[in-house]
Amino acid sequence: MFIFDSAKKIKREFIPQEQGKVSLYVCGPTVYDDAHLGHAKSALVFDLLCRVLNANGYEVTYARNITDIDDKIINRAQEQNKTIKEVTDFYTDAYHKEMALLGISRPDIEPKATESLDAMYALVQKLLDNKHAYTTDDGDVYFDTSSDSKYLTLSNRVQDESEKLQRVQSSSQKRNPADFALWKSIHDESVTFGSPFGKGRPGWHLECSAMIEKHLSKPNAKFAVDIHGGGADLLFPHHENEAAQTRCATDHALAAYWMHNGFVNIDGEKMSKSLGNSFFLKDALKIYDGEVLRFYLLSTHYRSNFNFNEEDLATAKKRLDKIYRLKKRLFGVTYEDEKTDFKKELLETLSDDLNISASLALIEEMITRANETLDTAGKHKELKREALSNLSFIEKILGFGIKNPYEYFQFGVNEETKTEIAKLIEKRAEAKKSKDFAASDMLRDKILAYGVNLMDTPQGSFWEKI
């Protein structure tokens, strides 16, 4: 398996520290608002990575944090006249539900910042003891970037004072403009945490380093984790600062491999709530099936920036429809999992830095061949079983085609209408059983009046939205 390492800027063969086992940490959401498509893209990329690692026989321990300490959360709580916990619980729950609709599995470990304060205090103390941090007269604790000879080697940035002043909070008590807060002393606000350094709140960069040390780091390991992932916008300063903290507080580096997914853009602009052009995931899910969004957001290589537009989304749906139409042709077929050339080739392609474009091309070719075979030898059970086995592998490794094919084509029909159609189908089945064909035809017309197609199969009658 090969992964493009963002730190080394090359594609490298993936070799975990412990044979057969992989530790993965991904920066999760700050839960002060609804998830947008950028959050979805990142979560999907690393969900796919876990699936591919598992398919290659690795046992994966996947951690993705929840940032529930942040100034934005405090501001939102004040705006809504709610407690911090009420705000973070609400948006965390919403995030989980929306990710589930995209077919994203929950991580093995999901640490919260509020549950990791002791680990943060320990990390800050180590940095102070190692002379990589200092305390100001105001009670703040800063990381001393000048003490770390490897600072900026992850992001490969050049010392640029103007850039650092733009991206890193300024303070007259900092020794260097690039120094960043490990602990922010706060005396005039109620949302503070007691610590050995006084009342205050942890720095954002500190949270992730501490949670990795607490949950994933192992004694005598060269790296705290095998793979560290996140959005490309986190490379600097967040991941740069994380790496510096871990390197200077412990006897190991933070990650053996770094993976970063590209931005999601709308009309060519980087998606960001601060720019006001964010497309909330919950709004997209009202219009499109979650699996369609999954297919669309994964349809370009994870490192490429993604330009979200409805024309491409409609095209993605048509490509996913092909999977379900083949699955529908095979409905009722039973099979045993078996090795096929297609599965081998698909896994090899995805194992090459998650090469999704080539993978989707393979899937299209397989669907075309399967349909041609079914057209000419439709009763050949072995061919049907092979096609269904291939579809099952696509479902497992990519999360495409997970639904009943008839239910997939019912998206957009409300539950009340679905219930009414189900009742009519049941009545029609009874009429056909009693050979009341006039009633059966009348009931069929009533069903079709809902704007659906009705299909009679050996397994029963099914319908789909036109």
From Swiss-Prot:
Keywords: Aminoacyl-tRNA synthetase, ATP-binding, Cytoplasm, Ligase, Metal-binding, Nucleotide-binding, Protein biosynthesis, Zinc. Its cofactor is Zn(2+). The lineage of its organism: Bacteria, Pseudomonadati, Campylobacterota, Epsilonproteobacteria, Campylobacterales. GO terms for molecular function: ATP binding; cysteine-tRNA ligase activity; zinc ion binding. InterPro entries: Cys-tRNA-ligase, Cys-tRNA/MSH_ligase, Rossmann-like_a/b/a_fold, tRNA-synt_1_cat_dom, tRNAsynth_Ia_anticodon-bd. It catalyses: tRNA(Cys) + L-cysteine + ATP = L-cysteinyl-tRNA(Cys) + AMP + diphosphate. GO terms for biological process: cysteinyl-tRNA aminoacylation. It comes from Sulfurimonas denitrificans (strain ATCC 33889 / DSM 1251) (Thiomicrospira denitrificans (strain ATCC 33889 / DSM 1251)). This is Cysteine--tRNA ligase. SUPFAM superfamilies: Anticodon-binding domain of a subclass of class I aminoacyl-tRNA synthetases (SSF47323), Nucleotidylyl transferase (SSF52374). GO terms for cellular component: cytosol. Belongs to the class-I aminoacyl-tRNA synthetase family.
